Amino acid sequence: MHALMILCLAFDLAAIKLEPNLERRSERALDNAAGAMDTARDASSAGESEKVKAAVEELRDSVDLAYQSLVDSGKSARRSPKFFKRAELKTRELMRRLEGLAQAVDAEDRVFVVSVRDRVSQVHDNLIQDIMQKK
């Protein structure tokens, strides 16, 4: 069951990577991250530690893909902020939800969830810096 869930999540991320439009790829990756967050929350409620970890890893990979897609687009966040701002808002929401998840999981899983929250926070800070920088 656990392997099947990982395979399904990886398939979704692989399909997202095939999206040729980098901005749309970023949005789809962040939507996938939100879905992974829902999966992690449900698994946490059910007490399934391995599923929580797999879903949080998927969330981290999705956020990284979203940010890298925006960077690879070559567009300036200052001149074309639409997708950068959307990503910033979604990562802020994910950080808030990860904080709640970190408080809900066991102590052994908390370290991993907090490390992913810190990574999402770093991406969020990078997005804000990209939007706010002058040249």
Model feature map: region roles:
Residues 1-7:
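Sec-dependent signal peptide recognition
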Residues 8-135:
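Long, charged/polar, soluble alpha-helical segments
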